[in-house]
A protein has these predicted regions:
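Nucleotide-activated chemistry modules centered on ATP-dependent adenylation/adenylyltransferase
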Residues: 1-64, 80-264
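Short, glycine-rich nucleotide/cofactor-binding loops
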Residues: 64-73
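Hydrophobic positions on the alpha1 helix immediately C-terminal to the Walker A/P-loop
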Residues: 76-77
Length: 264
């Protein structure tokens, strides 16, 4: 898949129109480029201030939750947050049939960095029903989009729940620029989305094929008591300079993966 060489926007985004030089239509607009540069500067400043303020959060055993998939970006994020910012990191993995190489990377990195880890394994029966329904009721963009747009809110919401439960102020995701789709997130999930919206996909709630227990896998702040303290959900790579080759080199050099080809 082609991505814009400036902002890493995927070609699949409507209106991307990546030209022969590898630049998307949005970056070719001077006013858009200027606004994007201003936003990037603001995001970098916000991220630096936020990470430094989160260190040794009073009343919490951890300063941040990091969703950990076993891929290079989440592995390197663990290292940077711990080594560069001194944060107490809690790694979190939602295990939906992760491949063996991902688990190998996870175990290796956690041992190397000495980081605590929480794993959630949703019930097999629920996942079977969920994926069967999604594959039989695909949206126009196909199976990958159909599944990922439901799977992602499960693990994102679970990470938010974990942060709330443990009074952790930040969830920091290893999304690289262009991930997830910009329509879902650019640097930060909107605070109103975390504190005021039910994340249950309406078509799942309305189809009659899922029980209340099934739907409870999706995060909903509407069920939480008044006064709940909600975390911020940020994507640091959206603010930092990002170089995929450098990330692969670093995780290999640090021994977070066994070989560079494991850093997918």
């Amino acid at each position: 898949m082609k991505k814009c060489t400036r902002c890493l926007l995927p070609e699949t985004v409507p209106g991307a129109d990546i030209d022969a030089a590898g630049v998307c239509a949005f970056c070719r607009r001077p006013e858009t480029s200027s606004a994007a540069n201003a936003a990037a500067t603001a995001n970098r400043a916000d991220l630096e201030a936020t990470l430094r303020a989160a260190r040794n959060t009073p009343g919490a055993a951890y300063d941040c939750v990091v969703p950990l998939s076993g891929g290079k970006d989440s592995l390197y994020l663990l290292h940077r947050l711990q080594a560069d910012y001194g944060l107490r990191v809690l790694a979190f993995t939602c295990d939906i049939d992760l491949p063996p190489v991902a688990w190998s990377n996870i175990r290796r990195a956690l041992r190397k960095l000495d980081i605590d880890h929480v794993v959630l394994r949703p019930a097999h029966g629920f996942l079977t029903r969920l994926f069967r329904y999604l594959l039989c009721n695909q949206e126009e963009r196909g199976a990958v989009y159909t599944v990922s747009y439901v799977y992602a809110p499960i693990f994102e919401g679970a990470a938010i729940r974990l942060a709330i439960e443990k009074n952790i102020p930040l969830v920091l995701a290893g999304y690289s620029p262009g991930q997830p789709e910009p329509e879902r997130m650019l640097y930060e999930f909107a605070p109103a989305l975390i504190s005021g919206e039910d994340w249950t996909p309406p078509h799942l709630a309305e189809c009659g094929q899922f029980s209340a227990a099934d739907l409870a896998h999706f995060y909903s702040p509407l069920q939480l008591p008044a006064g709940t303290r909600f975390p911020r959900y940020l994507a640091p790579y959206h603010a930092w300079d990002y170089d995929q080759a450098e990330v692969i080199r670093k995780v290999t050099e640090l021994g977070l993966v066994q070989r560079s080809h494991h850093a997918n």
